[in-house]
């Protein structure tokens, strides 16, 4: 691969010789009479730590003073903010007071805050470079960031300034915030976890970079048409003021081709990957501000571009108009969409291509930055920690090994020692079928050199296993990175384990399960110390302060009068003093009701259905998947509907009204998940128009669920559903968000539900269903023994089969999966317990005083689930990095940040 850099020369200019006062390879020209300042040849990563000190000293004092004098400092009051907004309206957007609408006002306000952030971003990069400290690089295929403007306002502490300033200019801040499209860089919990981690890394002042892909159309925008999910492009990049194109940071990424072995002039055997296709990776940077700190870290996203350019003029002139742009269109598909449909072979190739494109560009960037330090390669893992968020970036292990042996000339063992001390791997699944695998023929065609390296890694690993366990031949096949199937497959999770120094799960149950099930053999090979647990967390800045500002203010008033609890969430335990305070509980209830009114208005606006804010709001919003069991939820709703229909009017008056709210996307190729969405909407169409039922039950599906919608939905929850089959959900984080906002949980003993129960107490959560240790026996009984359906579930299926909710054939596969095909996710086994527990929820909700006590107690005990705690654990036990606090580490006066 090669990087393109920007330099220019002009005839007649004096030749510039390397400066003796600033002995830097990338500097050109002496300092002195006739020279204004050293000229820096643009590189990927700016100056190294030693270089930045030398170059600062080489700049004449008057020039340094001029740069310091005129350096931007960012607005701090309403007047300066208004000045910045008006300036951007008139000079950046070419508008005026007379044609500045809300979209333009959003753009100008965003640009004003962006300018402020980028000033701190520059200083942060200078500070981190000057300190020459170890960095963490977080590789995630998803970063579900949500809206940036509101987050920036709150993190820099100037939302009230912006609110007043926008009001002076004739705008409501709420209207301006709502103009922003969510950044479509993720789908579910994986991406939101990565976003929370970026927030915490910046807020805790850790030197950190995120690396991802800049998806042109996101995963997709979900529309519901006639009850069905329809995927359309998400044009979120139409205006995005939060990114900085780095057109001078371009990396050539190679695909296909062949491997040539040869001997160099010294007779040393060499390997060269040659031929094939080149695609350019172009960098886009997004500033990530910390809360109540000057630290502003970086998220670097890669966009794909044709190496030959966007347009072939020769083909166009010859009349071949389609081919003239074909190369660019083919290249752009790599970063067009998150998770391309992989039901087809071309989709599989595109996914693997996407993953390599991203990790290769990121590794090139990381290695270039390290080489600036002029350190020995043996110090690489002392300066660089790379965390793999799931198996998607696992190719980074192979790519770093390739760089070290093929390009840097290291011996295999030395290179592998560096690689295996650099990476950490976070596993996010306990489902064997969810562990990523790629076919060997696909690898051979797309990445021939990497397949060779994988085979070599596997051979050396298996040889070490055989030496350690000489009489266990079966163990070799069980731990082999190459699965001996037809075709052979590369097991990416196994590669990640072998190439990482630490492997962590994301909840106590999950970490225990992976050690006793899917990775049991690796615990035997490597020992238990390689495996650890870091329970997931969420950032309270977005999920409490931003999503639920009134509750945040109320909590602040009871925890010392400041927002300190947002940086130390354990301060929430002060709230337990007020569980019997009537005035406090009254204000708490008023805030919850106001949030429910806000959600009810959103439901009315988006679906046309009117719901009663006084009803119990029962919410399940997350990625649609059979293991998350939205199907059990909607079957429970149908059971409730049938029960209401069978009641007399007098009996119905005793019922607590309920609104069942669903949201989430199904993968485009996941037909069963799409069927669940169709059933939810079909049930809603019947129930919401049944006059016998009225307000006693409403069924709502909110389309295109995303972070900004979650900020409306989660604070309004009374009960939220986290009902995955026990042992299938690694952690989950939406459960934490709901509880932090004063909602209770109905859930199984799975993922983080267990640890939430440990923290808040069994009396404050509604648990049901079988335990993880029972699951395999139940599945065996389904397939080889008796499988009797719960009578209530049978009645639900009968109603579906009678076309109560539309054509029964549309839902035949969903019902058949339970009745005839083994009920893999144990809906039938847990359905009775689920309904009984829902009845307990109904009863508990009637006693509002006791319900509020449960809610307040739960929030008070949620301090453990901050992503700040999570990141500190990673930093200490896996990454071995230290925070770099502004003002405590010295710094540079330079105004050119390291890129």
Regions found by a protein language model. Give the residues of each.
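A conserved ligand/cofactor-binding region detector
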Residues: 2-899
């Amino acid at each position: 691969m090669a990087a393109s850099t920007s330099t220019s020369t002009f005839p007649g200019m004096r030749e510039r010789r390397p400066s003796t006062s600033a002995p830097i390879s990338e500097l050109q020209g002496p300092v002195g009479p006739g020279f204004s300042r050293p000229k820096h040849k643009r590189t990927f990563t700016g100056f190294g730590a030693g270089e930045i000190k030398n170059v600062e000293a080489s700049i004449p004092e008057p020039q340094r003073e001029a740069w310091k004098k005129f350096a931007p400092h960012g607005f701090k009051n309403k007047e300066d903010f208004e000045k910045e907004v008006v300036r951007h309206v008139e000079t950046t957007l070419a508008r005026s007071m007379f044609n500045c609408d809300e979209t333009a006002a959003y753009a100008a306000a965003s640009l004003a805050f962006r300018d402020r952030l980028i000033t701190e971003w520059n200083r942060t990069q200078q500070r981190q470079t000057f300190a020459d400290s170890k960095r963490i690089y977080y590789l995630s295929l998803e970063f579900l960031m949500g809206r940036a403007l509101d987050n920036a306002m709150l993190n820099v502490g100037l939302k009230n300034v912006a609110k007043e300033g926008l009001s002076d200019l004739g705008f409501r801040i709420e209207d301006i915030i709502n103009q922003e499209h969510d950044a479509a860089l993720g789908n579910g919990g994986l991406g939101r976890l990565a976003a929370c981690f970026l927030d915490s890394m910046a807020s805790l002042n850790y030197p950190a970079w995120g690396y991802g892909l800049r998806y042109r159309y996101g995963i997709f925008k979900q529309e519901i048409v006639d009850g069905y999910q329809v995927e359309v492009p998400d044009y979120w990049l139409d205006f995005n003021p939060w990114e900085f194109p780095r057109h001078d940071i371009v990396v050539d990424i190679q695909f296909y081709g062949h491997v040539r072995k040869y001997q160099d002039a010294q007779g040393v055997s060499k390997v060269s990957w040659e031929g094939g296709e080149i695609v350019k990776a172009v960098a886009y940077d997004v500033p990530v501000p910390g809360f109540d700190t000057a630290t502003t870290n970086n998220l670097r996203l890669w966009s794909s571009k044709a190496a030959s350019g966007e347009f072939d003029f020769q083909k166009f002139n010859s009349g071949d108009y389609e081919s003239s742009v074909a190369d660019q269109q083919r290249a752009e598909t790599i970063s067009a969409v998150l998770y391309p449909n992989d039901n087809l072979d071309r989709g599989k190739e595109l996914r693997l291509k996407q993953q390599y494109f991203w990790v290769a560009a990121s590794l090139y960037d990381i290695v270039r930055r390290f080489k600036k330090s002029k350190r020995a390669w043996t110090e690489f893992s002392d300066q660089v920690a790379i965390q793999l968020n799931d198996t998607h970036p696992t190719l980074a292990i192979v790519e770093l090994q390739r760089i070290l042996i093929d390009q840097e000339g290291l011996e295999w063992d030395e290179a592998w020692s560096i690689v295996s001390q650099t990476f950490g791997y976070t596993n996010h699944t306990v489902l064997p079928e969810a562990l990523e695998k790629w076919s060997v023929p696909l690898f051979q065609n797309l990445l021939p050199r990497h397949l060779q390296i994988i085979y070599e890694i596997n051979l050396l690993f298996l040889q070490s296993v055989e030496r350690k366990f000489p009489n266990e031949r079966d163990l070799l096949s069980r731990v082999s990175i190459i699965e001996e199937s037809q075709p052979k497959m590369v097991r990416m999770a196994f590669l990640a384990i072998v190439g990482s120094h630490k492997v962590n799960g994301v909840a106590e149950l999950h970490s225990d399960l992976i050690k006793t099930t899917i990775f049991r053999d690796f615990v035997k090979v490597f020992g238990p110390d390689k495996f650890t647990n870091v329970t997931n967390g969420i950032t309270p800045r977005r999920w409490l302060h931003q999503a639920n500002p009134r509750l945040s203010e109320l909590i602040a008033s009871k925890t010392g009068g400041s927002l300190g609890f947002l940086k130390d969430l354990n301060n929430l335990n002060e709230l337990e003093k007020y569980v019997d305070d009537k005035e406090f509980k009254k204000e708490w209830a008023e805030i919850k009701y106001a949030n429910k009114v806000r959600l009810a208005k959103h439901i009315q606006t988006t679906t046309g259905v009117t719901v009663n804010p006084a009803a119990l709001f029962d919410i399940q919003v997350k990625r649609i998947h059979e293991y998350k069991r939205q199907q059990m939820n909607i079957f429970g709703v149908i059971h409730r509907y049938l029960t209401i229909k069978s009641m007399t009017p007098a009996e119905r008056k005793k019922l607590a009204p309920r609104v069942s709210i669903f949201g989430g996307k199904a993968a485009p190729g996941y037909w069963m998940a799409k069927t669940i969405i169709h059933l939810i909407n079909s049930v809603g169409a019947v129930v919401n128009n049944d006059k016998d039922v009225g307000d006693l039950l409403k069924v709502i599906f909110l389309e295109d669920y995303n972070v900004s919608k979650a900020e409306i939905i989660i604070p309004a929850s009374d009960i939220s559903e986290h009902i995955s089959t026990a042992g299938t959900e690694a952690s989950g984080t939406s459960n934490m968000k709901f509880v932090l906002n004063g909602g209770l949980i109905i859930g199984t003993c799975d993922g983080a539900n267990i640890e939430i129960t440990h923290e808040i107490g069994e009396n404050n959560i509604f648990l049901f269903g079988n335990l993880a240790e029972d699951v395999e026996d139940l599945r065996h009984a389904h397939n080889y023994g008796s499988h009797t359906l719960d009578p209530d579930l049978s009645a639900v299926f009968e109603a579906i089969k009678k076309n109560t909710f539309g054509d029964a054939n549309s839902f035949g596969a969903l019902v058949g999966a339970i009745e005839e095909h083994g009920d893999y996710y144990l809906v039938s086994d847990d359905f009775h317990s689920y309904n009984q527990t829902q009845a307990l929820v109904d009863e508990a909700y009637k006693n509002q005083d006791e319900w509020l006590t449960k809610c307040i107690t739960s929030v008070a005990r949620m301090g453990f689930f901050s992503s700040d705690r999570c990141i500190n654990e990673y930093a200490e036990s896996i990454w071995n990095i230290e925070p770099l606090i502004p003002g405590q580490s010295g710094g540079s006066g330079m105004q050119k940040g390291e890129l």
